[in-house]
């Protein structure tokens, strides 16, 4: 069958993770655990980008940045505070989203799975290691774009390009070119942290 051909193309580690499941359970695990994993990364990326675009370009557009620059706060402290005000909510929302998705996935699939099956180790790495790195990537690119943008909308639209690598991960996972595993997720997180630095 088509499912058997798809499963044969998967890495051995991924095949082992679904061994012992019937076909309906395999579909649930593939859909909820593997195929949606890269899409989860869009959440911290976009939250950080929107908040950063408003914080940097939006302040410039509203002409409120000048007042901040006249305060006794150093430029460095102001930059760090603005970056943290984008990064912290993005990571918090990603972690809350992870918890809500964990509950929802287990409740929705209980009839098929009959047990708690989510999250697996790969998702824990994705939420705790990769999501903050992706938020940092969105933040960094938006800060760079905001320095040249005149308006919040312009900064947000130009910074939206940062979602393209994540969309490539989504397409790669859906087409079978790329399979998320714990090791790939750890490597992906390391790559994003290096880019952030």
Locations of regions flagged by a protein language model:
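Hydrophobic alpha-helical transmembrane segments that constitute the membrane-spanning cores
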Residues: 47, 80-109, 133, 137-138
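A structural motif at transmembrane helix-loop-helix junctions in multipass membrane proteins
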Residues: 55, 114-163
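Transmembrane helix boundary and interhelical loop/hinge segments in multi-pass membrane proteins
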Residues: 48-67
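Alpha-helical transmembrane segments of multi-pass membrane transporters/translocases
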Residues: 181-197
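Long, hydrophobic alpha-helical segments
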Residues: 31-53
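Membrane-interfacial helix-loop-helix connectors in multipass membrane proteins
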Residues: 21, 26, 99-128, 177-181
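Short helix-to-coil transition segments within interhelical loops
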Residues: 67-75
């Amino acid at each position: 069958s088509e499912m058997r051909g798809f499963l044969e193309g998967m890495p051995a580690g991924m095949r082992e993770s679904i061994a012992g499941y019937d076909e309906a359970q395999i579909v649930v695990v593939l859909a909820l655990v593997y195929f949606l994993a890269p899409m989860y990364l869009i959440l911290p990326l976009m939250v950080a980008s929107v908040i950063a675009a408003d914080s940097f370009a939006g302040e410039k557009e509203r002409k409120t940045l000048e007042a901040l620059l006249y305060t006794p706060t150093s430029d460095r402290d102001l930059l760090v505070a603005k970056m943290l005000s984008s990064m912290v909510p993005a990571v918090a929302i990603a972690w809350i989203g992870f918890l809500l998705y964990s509950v929802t996935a287990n409740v929705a699939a209980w009839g098929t799975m009959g047990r708690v099956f989510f999250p697996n180790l790969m998702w824990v790495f994705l939420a705790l290691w990769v999501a903050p790195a992706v938020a940092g990537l969105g933040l960094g690119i938006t800060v760079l774009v905001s320095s040249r943008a005149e308006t919040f909308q312009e900064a947000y639209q130009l910074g939206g390009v940062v979602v393209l690598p994540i969309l490539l991960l989504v397409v790669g996972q859906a087409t079978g070119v790329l399979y998320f595993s714990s090791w790939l997720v750890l490597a992906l997180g390391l790559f994003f942290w290096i880019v952030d630095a």
